[in-house]
Amino acid sequence: MQRSPLEKASVVSKLFFSWTRPILRKGYRQRLELSDIYQIPSADSADNLSEKLEREWDRELASKKNPKLINALRRCFFWRFMFYGILLYLGEVTKAVQPLLLGRIIASYDPDNKEERSIAIYLGIGLCLLFIVRTLLLHPAIFGLHHIGMQMRIAMFSLIYKKTLKLSSRVLDKISIGQLVSLLSNNLNKFDEGLALAHFVWIVPLQVALLMGLIWELLQASAFCGLGFLIVLALFQAGLGRMMMKYRDQRAGKINERLVITSEMIENIQSVKAYCWEEAMEKMIENLRQTELKLTRKAAYVRYFNSSAFFFSGFFVVFLSVLPYALIKGIVLRKIFTTISFCIVLRMAVTRQFPWAVQTWYDSLGAINKIQDFLQKQEYKTLEYNLTTTEVVMENVTAFWEEGFGELFEKAKQNNSNRKTSNDDDSLFFSNFSLLGTPVLKDINFKIERGQLLAVAGSTGAGKTSLLMMIMGELEPSEGKIKHSGRISFCSQFSWIMPGTIKENIIFGVSYDEYRYRSVINACQLEEDISKFAEKDNIVLGEGGITLSGGQRARISLARAVYKDADLYLLDSPFGYLDVLTEKEIFESCVCKLMANKTRILVTSKMEHLKKADKILILHEGSSYFYGTFSELQNLRPDFSSKLMGYDSFDQFSAERRNSILTETLRRFSLEGDAPVSWTETKKQSFKQTGEFGEKRKNSILNPINSIRKFSIVQKTPLQMNGIEEDSDEPLERRLSLVPDSEQGEVILPRISVISTGPTLQARRRQSVLNLMTHSVNQGQSIHRKTAASTRKVSLAPQANLTELDIYSRRLSQETGLEISEEINEEDLKECFFDDMESIPAVTTWNTYLRYITVHKSLIFVLIWCLVIFLAEVAASLVVLWFLGNTPPQDKGNSTYSRNNSYAVIITRTSSYYVFYIYVGVADTLLAMGFFRGLPLVHTLITVSKILHHKMLHSVLQAPMSTLNTLKAGGILNRFSKDIAILDDLLPLTIFDFIQLLLIVIGAIAVVAVLQPYIFVATVPVIVAFIMLRAYFLQTSQQLKQLESEGRSPIFTHLVTSLKGLWTLRAFGRQPYFETLFHKALNLHTANWFLYLSTLRWFQMRIEMIFVIFFIAVTFISILTTGEGEGTVGIILTLAMNIMSTLQWAVNSSIDVDSLMRSVSRVFKFIDMPTEEGKPTRSTKPYKNGQLSKVMVIENSHVKKDDIWPSGGQMTVKDLTAKYTEGGNPILENISFSISPGQRVGLLGRTGSGKSTLLSAFLRLLNTEGEIQIDGVSWDSITLQQWRKAFGVIPQKVFIFSGTFRKNLDPYEQWSDQEIWKVADEVGLRSVIEQFPGKLDFVLVDGGCVLSHGHKQLMCLARSVLSKAKILLLDEPSAHLDPVTYQIIRRTLKQAFADCTVILCEHRIEAMLECQQFLVIEENKVRQYDSIQKLLNERSLFRQAISPSDRVKLFPHRNSSKCKSQPQIAALKEETEEEVQDTRL
């Protein structure tokens, strides 16, 4: 970044914002980059501002029982705030004084007042000076207030972030990620631009009092008629506002429904394509869109009348003020023109400025109170450690995640029983609730000495992760004692990758030791993976590390924990995503050898790990089931496997699981709302399911993963598009909103890779931060960076003869705080938080406007209609002028009406009224025409929005995966949320305003040109200057806006990243490191935002200066060239003032239109995406009703005579090559093999070898070459949809969308209830579905959060059974499953798919043992394709992975003659607790 010219700028340069000229010039000539932006002043840095506010807030907390955040803000910013407020007031006062001088100038042309003619020129000079003074006062004042608002936002951003890192886990579990982002976006947004309006609360009353005093002097009591009308108008607008709020609330629910389904569709687009659900999803979303648009139209009409009421009120204000006085006393011309000018100022103050100011204060105080409540929430308390102890001891420890559960369930049950429902099964729904709060851990005792390994095992939900949380201090024990040294390292169950390089992720801010680092890399088996990257370990990983496989992420996470020098290592199921061989190697080399001298607690259920552990702790339902050594376990608890894992008690187990699931559901739906929910209030919010899921989404626009991925708010609209809070009302005229979105800024955690093998996060709308922290989203973007990470080496050359273990054990330097400010610059940060750069030009092209206008043919006719009415209005005004011009002098005094603006002009004398009545008649007619001309325009523009949404949705659903993989899910969702909302809400009324203002200016110029042709000559260069200035500014402005928007992404991404890794952050003590990173992200955004504000003020000031020059010219031309016509001077000067203020508004409005049209450009970009191959490449006849045509059957003799394909499931693969993108590197090369009908094939290979990719290639979800035949039919000879329907799919990432059970199982409604129930029975879902009210019609929301992961897998299995597919693709179906569900899946595969071809990708050996053939993939190619016997006889990967016990199971006859094998204890499930509901971990 460059040094800012502001530092050396003179006072004049600062006053006129001339210091921004270099950036404006550069932006006009070339594209701006981040390096072109100026550095921020030190006073605006996040460090300084946050320190200042934090100091005052701490002082407030220390001194008062009820601390007020507003007091801390007042002490920081009050005096500067008031100084700029006084400047603003003085600027507004000049507006009130201008009409006085205008009246004196007009009066000087009165034939009876000739003595004042000589001073007219001086009055003109005075009037012009007032304009100059106003310009010099207003612009610095507005900029100063915006600047203070920015500083307040930055300080509070930082304060909230710091508080977030300190919150206790219990508090985090009650706060949704959406609420946190809401605090950092819409609430704080109110300060940025709202602060400039805040002063009008006291300025407007003073201004109204001054104006009414001046008008009283002219018109006496009749002045209050106009004021009365304005007050009535303001109340009318308030009423319209309330009506609009009602429609907004109704519509918000519908938008939520649509966006939830859309986000689920985008997130699971691969599954949608695999299931061939494109048409079903499109129909579902379009139906919701239709309902939404009905309310959109109603809201738009109300807003239109609200907006047009202001435009058309000017005539009535003047008319009502002047008429009573004229009828009673008669009136002179000077008073009319002076009154018109006064009324213009009065109208703006009463109907616009005051309501905006009140709304600003209401919003700001509400935001401050919310932030204040948040800052007082309970903080995380670190346990008291004993640094001298070397052992880890737990004595009689009991802990609860939450107290008061009993009351909650009791009240919820009563509430449910009181509810009148048509369903008799509600009692079932609550029948299994425990009415007592159960401890997550109870009476736990163990003791391990230094250097020992404790293995913690247990079933899903037993409390293993909670045990580690308690040791770390995240969970407070209610009873008992915990003792350890406090120097902890932690590896999370779900690997957490921060944006940065691999090296930075492993070192994690700790001092760098080259040799320790290398030993850790080797022990964690990362060397081979790192060597594949061109930048080695300096490759920059985006959010979540999307380019890495799940196993690679898990190993990096483990390496981070191992690299830190600690006394106690907590490893929470670190091997969940590793293949058997890699897991075995890492356990031996890392956990057993490298860390041999360290105290380790490993959560695992693998028998091999239990055997090697010094001590074993087995948990069951939160209690200690066993504690001791492995040999003791075999002797004392021979039944522990079946007891814990529930093999012998399926019915009881599933009932318990359902109980925990529904209990968690009740808790989640009961804890909604922004404020802390007391237990006594929960009955109002108890769990409720209805036929429509929209009711529960009143405050949510995105489901939680999209809350995580993207939070967007629409600009300039009261509709809140990120929908976090229901009581947050955005000001109507918000120019910018600080919410992440891509082009207008988007915070995106990019879509999960379609072939990623890591964990997935099921969508939940009100997902708590705690749940967020227990899930990993495999998202991010790979960015290549040339420069290596800047890290400081602190170790010297290794001493001779040091072993790897010695090097590892050597204590690292205690100096762990890197010099962050020196080592992390904005460029690095920007790279880490990489975001897609849009290839959209800085200014909207004419082609975009043309395409937009021609989307709907009616729009052209509506625009012509608007033009015709405008011409009629101008013609009527000119006719009246002509009529007056031809009136005999004695009758002069009639009426001139210029219906160009709402600013009516009356010229009358008391002698005659008949022209006055003509004027009123013409005005009323034209008013009615003008009032309703905008309605067809608004209506048609909403129809255009409807068409564009439909086209874009169709385009996204039909786009190939190679295209969708290059886009981030947040970016796609932004098109459907933010951009469609702009097309629905903002664009119609902004275009209406612009057209209205443009026509007003043209009409006024036409009238002035008729009256005084000289002024028309002066107007032309001014308009040319305005157009040139706009074009010059717009180039830079839009680029700065783009950079500013992109600068928001790091802020919100960093917040979410920090929350996801919060336990890791705290365990490593890296909060200060991350606070500094956050401040860097804030400063990066501030630099862009400050420059945007400065250039915007430069532009506004230049417009004002042109206006002042024009007005000076007009004033002196009219004074010097007009003879005895006071009426002509009055019309010219009044219109000149109005022309220029309206022209300024029109220019600003045109910039708004251009900015909003960028949304249209983005939508068109998506509409123009390539589509998937919809037709076969060879010429064939179409298929009908799911069957191939007769011609196809004849051509393919393999197809049976009953016309059904596929019939057997034989599959032949020839030279298959797969790529992610066209022209990219092949991921799979020359794959060839064949599968017989009904055969089971297992895919083998290391993590990341391409097993899941092969399954995607079968479905043609990638760019493929080669050929695949099914039952003799080649994939080139039939359509894509028909090909995919041949497969049944159980994907790695389970897809449950918001809708009923029936819709989720059969979205096309092809099957009867009997058939669905039969299949549900087959897969073990009947008992689950029957537990819910409504059964098949029960509405699942938020990715099916009421279901366990196992139940979701069974849903996918049921879909495959219903599809009657002959080939089944299973991608790790047992990942995260409890053994019961796993047994159901195995049983169903044997029964329902007995005669089907099955291709299985699986890490569990026992599942693979059922396959007849195995396909081994290594280095993108087929290494082996053989039967299990051949693989076991050779030195293959499979032979290395399989244990002797599994070989005994496979071939018992080979061992029968040898010694009898020892009884084996079945391996415990290595589960990841992703779906544990009752412990919320």
From Swiss-Prot:
Phosphoserine modifications at: S549, S660, S670, S686, S700, S712, S737, S753, S768, S790, S795, S813, S1445, S1457
PROSITE patterns: ABC_TM1F, ABC_TRANSPORTER_1, ABC_TRANSPORTER_2
Bilayer topology: Multi-pass membrane protein
Extracellular side: 99-122, 217-222, 320-339, 880-918, 1012-1013, 1117-1130
Parts of the chain that traverse the membrane: 78-98, 123-146, 196-216, 223-243, 299-319, 340-358, 859-879, 919-939, 991-1011, 1014-1034, 1096-1116, 1131-1151
Annotated catalysed reactions: ATP + H2O + closed Cl(-) channel = ADP + phosphate + open Cl(-) channel; chloride(in) = chloride(out); hydrogencarbonate(in) = hydrogencarbonate(out); ATP + H2O = ADP + phosphate + H(+)
Residue numbers on the Cytoplasmic membrane side: 1-77, 147-195, 244-298, 359-858, 940-990, 1035-1095, 1152-1481
Residues binding ATP 1, per UniProt: W401, S434, G458, S459, T460, G461, A462, G463, K464, T465, Q493
Annotated residues for binding of ATP 2: Y1220, G1245, R1246, T1247, G1248, S1249, G1250, K1251, S1252
Glycosylation site list: N894, N900
Domain ABC transmembrane type-1: 81-365, 859-1155
ABC transporter domain span: 423-646, 1211-1444
Any one of the GO CC terms: nucleus
Bias (Acidic residues): 1471-1481
Family: Belongs to the ABC transporter superfamily. ABCC family. CFTR transporter (TC 3.A.1.202) subfamily.
Name this polypeptide is given: Cystic fibrosis transmembrane conductance regulator
Record lineage: Eukaryota, Metazoa, Chordata, Craniata, Vertebrata
Gene: CFTR
